[in-house]
């Protein structure tokens, strides 16, 4: 089950660190951790794991450019579990993620890998009772996975003692730093021991990310996927020119009449559009779930569970879902709207082809969107083809 379909070839990776590890056994990991890795279904390290786990274990600051589906969660989870001192019952590794869903996903992976270890992993996220966080932190959680707002709050209230923190890992750093978390993240940096190792993972390297590396990282090992390697392999990308906004729904209906798809994710740019589309599809007898950031956490969890178990066939979402949620049976992603943020395109279409599955991404494009689509093609060095007439063949 290695999450490595988008492994770039070694020639497509630029790095200032020359050690490559081809087998997990070569990393000299704790025996109990190795059992967890193989038990989880990892066989061999993905390209990013071959290069990034070792420098993290060695204590270097690491800046890794990797998008969803490359095995990056396994990379920092394995390294953190190797570095943790199980006898110290206090937070030693702090992992930040931009959304609650991604934080919970990471927590699940860390706990699965730590199955045979005496390690407590706590998710410190908004939408839950802060008293539960305080209790879990007091009870000796050694790895804390959280969202910036809640983590900052817990540290500020002195419920989260940072004296033993040795690793600070920022996942999806580009998303966090562009989503208004920058100030909180900077403050968290200042509340950690000065010797804390910093590991930063990001699909793209905008100025905000590079500023953090300059300010808070010490001679980082850089593992950067070349720009033109950022398109997800295994995803066939198409567009339909719908001319104008009012024709999008009819186009979507026609699409569903033409193809047989087990499950699909449809992305819209606003909550209002998610709600409108959900209502129209439901009125037309489709089984639909909708998810967006304002929903209470319990409701979001229920919706994701329904979709994962297959009781809902269509999930309509804002970009909340675009990062890090593993829904393995999804073969089709539809961008009802092109994303406002170019970086989110890769996360959206990456839903469809994780874990070696092929996926199809279809973009509904108005005449006004054509320029933005061409810009996406340039940005990712890719081609988005017009959807062919024999579209049913794509889903055989």
Swiss-Prot record:
Motif mapping: DEAD box: 171-174
GO molecular function: ATP binding; ATP hydrolysis activity; RNA binding; RNA helicase activity; translation initiation factor activity
Domain Helicase ATP-binding intervals: 53-223
GO biological process, one term: cytoplasmic translational initiation
Keyword field contains Methyltransferase: no
Subcellular location per the Swiss-Prot or TrEMBL entry: Cytoplasm
EC number per UniProt: 3.6.4.13
Residues the record lists as binding ATP: 66-73
Source domain of life: Eukaryota
Ranges of residues in domain Helicase C-terminal: 234-395
Entry keyword set: ATP-binding, Cytoplasm, Helicase, Hydrolase, Initiation factor, Nucleotide-binding, Protein biosynthesis, RNA-binding
SMART domains in the cross-refs: DEXDc (SM00487), HELICc (SM00490)
Family: Belongs to the DEAD box helicase family. eIF4A subfamily.
Function: ATP-dependent RNA helicase which is a subunit of the eIF4F complex involved in cap recognition and is required for mRNA binding to ribosome. In the current model of translation initiation, eIF4A unwinds RNA secondary structures in the 5'-UTR of mRNAs which is necessary to allow efficient binding of the small ribosomal subunit, and subsequent scanning for the initiator codon.
Name the record gives this protein: ATP-dependent RNA helicase eIF4A
Organism: Eremothecium gossypii (strain ATCC 10895 / CBS 109.51 / FGSC 9923 / NRRL Y-1056) (Yeast)
Highest classification ranks of the organism: Eukaryota, Fungi, Dikarya, Ascomycota, Saccharomycotina
Name of the encoding gene: TIF1
């Amino acid at each position: 089950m290695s999450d490595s379909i988008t492994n770039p070839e070694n020639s497509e990776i630029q790095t200032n660190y020359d050690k490559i590890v081809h087998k997990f056994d070569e990393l000299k990991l704790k025996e109990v951790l190795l059992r967890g890795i193989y038990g989880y279904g990892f066989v061999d390290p993905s390209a990013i794991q071959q290069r990034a786990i070792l420098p993290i274990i060695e204590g270097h600051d690491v800046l890794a450019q990797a998008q969803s589906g490359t095995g990056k969660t396994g990379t920092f989870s394995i390294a953190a579990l190797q570095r943790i001192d199980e006898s110290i019952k206090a937070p030693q590794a702090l992992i930040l993620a931009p959304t609650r869903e991604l934080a919970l996903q990471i927590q699940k992976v860390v706990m699965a890998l730590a199955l045979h270890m005496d390690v407590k992993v706590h998710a410190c996220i908004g939408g839950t009772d802060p008293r539960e966080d305080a209790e879990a932190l007091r009870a000796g959680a050694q790895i804390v996975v959280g969202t910036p707002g809640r983590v900052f709050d817990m540290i500020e209230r002195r419920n989260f003692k940072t004296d033993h923190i040795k690793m600070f890992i920022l996942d999806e750093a580009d998303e966090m730093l562009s989503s208004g978390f920058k100030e909180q993240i900077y403050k968290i940096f200042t509340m950690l021991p000065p010797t804390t190792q910093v590991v930063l993972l990001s699909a793209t390297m905008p100025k905000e990310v590079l500023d953090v590396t300059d300010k808070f990282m010490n001679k980082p090992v850089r593992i950067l996927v070349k720009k033109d390697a950022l398109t997800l392999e295994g995803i066939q990308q198409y567009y339909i020119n719908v001319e104008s906004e009012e024709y999008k729904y009819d186009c979507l209906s026609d699409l569903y009449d033409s193809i047989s798809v087990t499950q699909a994710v449809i992305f819209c740019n606003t909550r209002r559009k998610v709600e409108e589309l959900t209502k129209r599809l439901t009125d037309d007898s489709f089984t639909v779930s909708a998810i967006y950031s304002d929903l209470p956490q319990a409701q979001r969890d229920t919706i994701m569970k329904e979709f994962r178990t297959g009781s809902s066939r269509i999930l309509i979402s804002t970009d909340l879902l675009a990062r890090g949620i593993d829904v393995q049976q999804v073969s089709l992603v539809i961008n009802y709207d092109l994303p406002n943020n170019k970086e989110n395109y890769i996360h959206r279409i990456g839903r469809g082809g994780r874990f070696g599955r092929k996926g199809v991404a279809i973009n509904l494009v108005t005449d006004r969107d054509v320029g933005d689509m061409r810009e996406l093609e340039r940005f990712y060095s890719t081609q988005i083809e017009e959807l062919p007439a024999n579209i049913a063949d794509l889903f055989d």
